[in-house]
A protein has these predicted regions:
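TOPRIM metal-binding catalytic domain and adjacent DNA-binding surface shared by DnaG-type primases
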Residues: 1-26, 41-43, 48-127, 135-138, ...
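Short recognition patches in nucleic-acid-associated and regulatory proteins
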Residues: 26-37
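Phosphate-handling DNA/RNA-contact segment within nucleic-acid enzymes
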Residues: 105-218, 234
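Short, surface-exposed amphipathic charged segments that create phosphate/polyanion-binding patches used
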Residues: 113-115, 194-201, 255-272
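Short, acidic/turn-prone active-site loops that include or flank metal/cofactor-
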Residues: 183-189, 226, 250-253
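Short, aromatic/basic amphipathic alpha-helical patches
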Residues: 232-242
């Protein structure tokens, strides 16, 4: 199919494509597993099957302006509270974290469905809203999430920072008083063999964007999921942050939120303390 540069040469908007790395080797050759996000510095790609990721720079000086995301009005009063409680999270403990509720259209759905949106950015500059259906596993995104979720809600003097794989995991930890953030784009399928280059590290640009916060913290807890992609993400984060500063959590559940839901706040606190 050609290189990523060739495949993305004519792309000028966020989309999904066939992955040139793995699509021909799969049984379902026509499934578009390569997500492409247009950023200020290039076209960021990530394959949700083989884990291939990177950034293709723009030819010349052509850069698409990233438009700010407008938040829709709240159309479902109580929906966010209902969702958080269903995940074992006390809403009053995470009120400063931007989560909105409403009805959203997802690909593959016949009509709009109830959904919650995790808001990225600041009140004056919303950069993305990541939506998930309440009753389905449907996901979609408005804008481009390129920073840690919850980074703007952290205490300025945070000494221990927990990094999670999903927004609900970060909310679960914050609800019991543990400062935590979530990566914006999930976990890779495997650890990349590419050398880490901060100037060309599109998928993990959020790590470099939070460098000041990370450097101030004396201890970074990697609280990614208890599966192979979660281990790969923990490894990729440690490569960029520095292994001497990182500790890995072992959860009794699948992740932080499941641990809170199935084992309780004490078990979640214990897992972090014993990292």
């Amino acid at each position: 199919m050609g290189s990523f540069e060739n495949v993305l040469s004519s792309v000028n908007e966020d989309c999904r494509l066939l992955c040139p790395e793995c699509s021909q080797e799969r049984k379902k050759k026509n499934v578009k597993t390569l997500s492409v996000t247009i950023t200020e510095n290039g076209k960021v790609y990530h394959c949700h099957h083989c884990g291939a990721s990177g950034k293709v720079p723009y030819a010349g000086s052509v850069i698409r302006e990233i438009k700010p995301v407008r938040l829709p009005p709240e159309t479902e009063p109580g929906l966010v509270e209902r969702f958080l409680k269903s995940r074992g999270i006390e809403p009053s403990k995470v009120m400063s974290y931007p989560v909105i509720g409403g009805r959203k259209f997802f690909r593959g759905q016949q009509d709009e469905i109830e959904a919650v949106g995790f808001v990225y950015g600041t009140p004056g500059e919303i950069t993305a809203v990541k939506w998930r259906g309440l009753e389905t596993k449907a996901f979609t995104q408005d804008g481009a999430a390129q920073e840690f979720y919850g980074i703007h809600q952290l205490p300025k003097d945070v000494d221990q920072l927990v990094i999670c794989e999903g927004e609900c995991d970060a909310l679960a930890l914050n609800s019991i008083g543990i400062p935590a953030v979530s990566v914006p784009n999930g976990a890779p399928q495997k650890v990349s063999r590419k050398q880490v280059d901060p100037s060309d590290d599109g998928k993990y640009g959020y790590v470099w964007a939070a460098r000041e916060t990370i450097e101030k913290a004396s201890r970074i807890i990697l609280a990614t999921d208890m599966d192979d992609p979660g281990e790969a993400l923990a490894e990729e984060l440690a490569r960029r942050i520095g292994r001497a500063k990182c500790w890995r959590v072992t959860f009794p559940g699948k992740d932080a939120n499941d641990t809170l839901l199935e084992h309780g706040a004490e078990a979640l606190q214990k897992a972090i303390d014993e990292a």
